Structure formats: structure tokens, C-alpha cells
Amino acid sequence: MLIISPSSEIAQSFLDNLDTNLNVYSISRRNFFHKSIKKNYIINSSDNLSNNKLRRYFGSIKFSYFISFIGDQKIEKKSLNEIKNKKILQIFNTNSIFPVKIVYCLINNNNFKAAAKIIFFSSRSGSITERGTKKHHSKKGNNIYRASKALLNSFVKNLAFQNKNTKKIIIAYDPGWVMTKSSGGGNISLSKSTKDLSLIIKKIGKKHSGKFLNNKFYEIKW
């Protein structure tokens, strides 16, 4: 298993309850240790990724599972026109481009097992169809975060389409409003979130590839 952003609260709760017989590797922007992680690789979202660079890290390792936990919501205190383009691109790169590019490189390097399950943490806030249709999604602000998740969803949909003739399962996943320090509230405990994710990993099959699923296994409109 390979995970990105192991330091997030949801990731740490997941790791705390993970089967210890599973070899877990992680990618983060700083040193990180967890008893369940065999090795952590420091790779920043600003790094120039390439097939060769990741080949030097992972060699011939083949992963059965990949989970990108990148998904912390950053509340924008300024209006869109007040935020510098450099900052906007940084958020897009971290939330959207970076995790997908990692997967593209790993696929090119044959670092996934044939029926690997690849999960990208996204957010319902990134649903274009649902924007403004529900109380939570009718709130103003946080435009860049929402747009970054919409971009991620588009990447995931395309990635799944490009791998439709393989056994790989690729989904976008909304864990719901989990009670973490960064969420500012929530209605799902960390322990419940861990159980939800474990069930998703266990149950998803090829028929789910290319879909945007929530923690109750319902499909969210793009």
C-alpha cells in the first residue's frame, strides 16, 4: 500500500487500525514516522515528478492499494481577486495535480498490481452539479478549494477512462464531514471514518471505477 499525506488526522486514524501484515509506504513533505509505515519518502508537491525519479524511489515494488489523503479544507479569508495567482496554482497543484501525477508515473513504471485499488480523497464541494443545491454547498467562499476538487475529480474520471481496459479500480472518494481540527466541526468521528474507508476499500470493484463515491457507498454527481 502507498499513501500520500500520512500526517492527516484521517490517515493516522486509518494507520492506527491497519492490518500490520500489510507493507505500507508513504509520501509526505516532511519526515514522518508511524509504526505501520515501512518507509516514508519526502516528496514535495512542488517537485518536478518523472517516471525516472519515482523509479529510483520504488524500484520494482508493486502496490495493491493507493490512497491519497490530501484533502484538508483551507478556508479563504480573501476574495478570489485578492489572492495571488501563485497561491492559487499552489493549491491546485497540491490538491489535484500532484497526487494524480504520482499515479500516472507509477502506472507507467508498472508499480501497481493488475487489480490495484486507487482512491483519491476528494470532496462533495467539488461537485459542479450539486453546487448551490444544498445548504452546505450554497455557502459562499472557498472558491479555490472547490475548484481544486472539481479539477481532481476530472483527473480521476479521465484516469479511470484511460484504464478502463485494465483491472485497476480508480475512484474519487468523499469521506463526509469528519471531525478533525482542520474541518472546524463535523458529524463523523475519526473511528467511524476509518471503518467507512476500510469498507470502501474492501467492497469496490471494477464496476465502481471512474465513479465519485461517498462514505455510504452512494454515487455523487460530478
Predicted regions and their residues:
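Rossmann-fold cofactor-recognition segment
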Residues: 29-50
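C-terminal helical subdomain
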Residues: 168, 172-173, 184-222
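Catalytic loop of short-chain dehydrogenase/reductase
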Residues: 72-102, 107, 115-164
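N-terminal Rossmann NAD(P)H-binding glycine-rich loop of SDR-like oxidoreductase domains
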Residues: 2-20
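Short-chain dehydrogenase/reductase
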Residues: 15, 55, 103, 156, ...
